[in-house]
């Protein structure tokens, strides 16, 4: 990635992540990304694969590396006052419904990811899956990005989100 102009959001963590990977972080608007890749204003991007398919980025970007670094969440939120007003039985029902929702959404999300990746692979010149040794280098950039961005996020919130994703080892390295 050395020297490549890599599209980032304005997230300080993503900016440092791309910089740690050796590319030149280039904050660039999502709605302009297709044209940016097409014209060479940006030469790469770090976007979850199904969104790349939805935005048809595979039409202008032909090389893909699968690093498993993107996560998308599907959440349910409720006002604490309303939640606290529920009876124990109502909370039990709510938790059961939320668990069922979570399972179904994960199932649908996984199918969406697979469909998007399959469509991209059909037109990509290359879909590369790094070796475990190569993944260690990708992960090192991520750890450095989080450390470099300290002070720009709430540590306890970040820790909880990462732990909920099963990233205990990653959190331990931070």
Segments from the language model and where they lie:
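N-terminal secretory/targeting leader peptides
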Residues: 2-174
């Amino acid at each position: 990635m050395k020297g490549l102009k890599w599209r980032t959001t304005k997230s300080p963590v993503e900016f440092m992540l791309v910089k740690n990977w050796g590319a030149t972080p280039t904050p660039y608007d999502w709605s302009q990304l297709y044209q940016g890749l097409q014209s060479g204003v940006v030469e790469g991007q770090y976007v979850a694969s199904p969104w790349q398919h939805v935005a048809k980025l595979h039409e202008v970007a032909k090389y893909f590396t699968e690093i498993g670094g993107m996560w998308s969440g599907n959440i349910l939120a409720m006002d604490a006052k309303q939640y606290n007003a529920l009876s124990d039985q109502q909370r039990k029902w709510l938790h059961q419904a939320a668990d069922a929702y979570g399972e179904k959404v994960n199932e649908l999300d996984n199918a969406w990811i697979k469909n998007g990746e399959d469509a991209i692979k059909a037109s990509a010149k290359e879909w590369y899956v790094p070796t475990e040794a190569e993944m260690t280098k990708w992960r090192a950039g991520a750890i450095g990005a989080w450390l470099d961005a300290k002070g720009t996020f709430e540590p306890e919130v970040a820790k909880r989100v990462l732990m909920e994703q099963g990233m205990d080892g990653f959190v331990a390295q931070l």
